[in-house]
């Protein structure tokens, strides 16, 4: 029973921390979107592509961390 409570505590902590961090990321993306105002900022399509490549690459890495919690085994 104690182990079950620990798991619940870990699950509750995950939800609390993940929700706060996700909200922070989404807010940061909204703020980044403010840079799209061409009357205030000047930028090239290449610069925009570079920004989104970096974001998409980090998103891919983070998704992978959630999908695979065990090390991959080498096979020939």
Label the predicted regions.
Residues 2-76:
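N-terminal intrinsically disordered, cationic/polar leader segments
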């Amino acid at each position: 029973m104690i182990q079950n409570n620990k798991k619940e505590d870990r699950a509750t902590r995950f939800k609390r921390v993940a929700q706060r961090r996700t909200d922070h990321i989404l807010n940061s993306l909204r703020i980044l979107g403010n840079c799209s105002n061409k009357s205030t900022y000047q930028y090239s399509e290449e610069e925009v592509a570079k920004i989104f490549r970096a974001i998409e690459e980090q998103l891919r890495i983070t998704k992978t961390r959630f999908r695979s919690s065990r090390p991959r085994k080498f096979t020939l």
